[in-house]
């Protein structure tokens, strides 16, 4: 009996179907310790337990609904993806008034109609909300403003730059969630998904520039083209750089963070230019404050990502919840939301001055 079993196992090995360690781990479907992991799954030595290792695709997918050290990494960005998906759906509706007040009205139940023609259907002027929006508009002043500007070209305030940003944010967040979910399946999946994750981050950074630059520089075609082309080229270079398998290694964590921050902070140049051009417009000034908040949020998240605080201070204590990557994810979502507010404010500004009559 023992001899027959040995012959059977030998046949499986010759056919390439041996019971290697990976197959045993997949069949066991248990959470492992850091020291038990294959080298390609060893990323953070301060997280000691609750690792998934080479589970089947089905089991890996279903693990999104169980507790392990990647659960909150998956769901923090999956929830962010849901938020931006909702924003995309709302923005794609023909009757939606894009702009900050338009989104506030959707959340508060208020009805908002703007004092100028826009992408939405409304042309009357009133704010109606007894609960959250107490803001009176002077109808006479509004009509005189419209008369002084003449007919407004609806094409001057397109939706597509805003939708580009939402697409980039959604792409980044879903790629991140899928990477944290499936990267443990195999070495091949690990390499593919982490490279996809880094490409998604680069995509969101590039797409984030489109709405504010397009609307802020709508009357300055050369500068608009220059800034959008520059950040797009920089983003493509970053993506091609990060596609290198060696740069996906844990030891290049600081390099990746520095590259992403460099891309993000390159926005200081167009932001300064916008401030110079539109310093007398309150919406622009407030938008720049939100952009500053975005930069602080992203930089803070990157600091947690690189330093591995707080798990560095107490290894093993933050395996399930509270470790640095989860905190980093929260700051990324908050930073993207801050940028959303800034972009909507710039859109409000552009809609108020559609004819470039500054």
UniProtKB/Swiss-Prot annotation:
Its main location: membrane. Highly expressed in roots and at lower levels in stems and flowers. It is found in: Membrane. The chain crosses the membrane at residues 71-91, 162-182, 199-219, 225-245, 257-277, 284-304, 327-347. Residues 1-26 are annotated as: Disordered. Residues 92-161, 220-224, 278-283, 348-358 are extracellular. Pfam families: HlyIII (PF03006). It is a multi-pass membrane protein. The keyword Transmembrane applies. Belongs to the ADIPOR family. May play a role in abiotic stress response. This is Heptahelical transmembrane protein 2.
């Amino acid at each position: 009996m023992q001899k027959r079993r040995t012959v059977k196992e030998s046949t499986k090995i010759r056919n390439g179907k041996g019971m290697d360690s990976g197959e045993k781990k997949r069949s066991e479907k248990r959470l492992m310790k850091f020291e038990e992991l294959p080298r390609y799954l060893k990323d953070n030595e301060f997280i000691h337990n609750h690792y998934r290792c080479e589970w089947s695709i089905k089991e890996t997918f279903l693990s999104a609904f169980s507790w392990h050290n990647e659960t909150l990494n998956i769901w923090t960005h999956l929830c962010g993806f849901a938020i931006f998906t909702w924003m995309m759906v709302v923005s794609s509706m023909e009757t939606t008034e894009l702009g900050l007040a338009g989104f506030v009205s959707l959340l508060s139940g208020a009805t908002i109609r703007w004092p100028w023609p826009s992408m939405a259907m409304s042309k009357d002027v009133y704010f109606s909300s007894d609960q959250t929006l107490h803001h009176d508009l002077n109808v006479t002043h509004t009509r005189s403003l419209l008369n002084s500007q003449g007919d407004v070209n609806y094409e001057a305030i397109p939706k597509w730059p805003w939708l580009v940003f939402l697409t980039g944010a959604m792409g980044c967040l879903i790629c991140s969630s899928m990477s944290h979910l499936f990267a443990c399946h195999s070495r091949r999946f690990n390499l593919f998904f982490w490279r996809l994750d880094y490409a998604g981050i680069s995509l969101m950074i590039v797409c984030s520039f489109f709405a504010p630059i397009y609307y802020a520089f709508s009357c300055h075609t050369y500068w608009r083209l220059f800034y959008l082309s520059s950040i797009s080229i920089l983003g493509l270079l970053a993506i091609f750089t990060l596609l290198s398998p060696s740069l996906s290694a844990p030891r290049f964590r600081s390099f990746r963070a520095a590259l992403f921050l460099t891309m993000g902070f390159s926005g200081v140049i167009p932001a300064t230019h916008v401030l110079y051009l539109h310093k007398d417009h309150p919406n622009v000034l407030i938008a720049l404050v939100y952009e500053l908040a975005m930069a602080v949020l992203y930089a803070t998240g990157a600091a947690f990502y690189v330093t591995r605080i707080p798990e560095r201070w107490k290894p093993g204590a933050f395996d399930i919840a509270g470790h640095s990557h989860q905190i980093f994810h929260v700051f990324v979502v908050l930073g993207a939301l801050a940028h959303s507010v800034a972009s909507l404010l710039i859109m409000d500004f552009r809609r108020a001055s559609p004819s470039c009559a500054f």
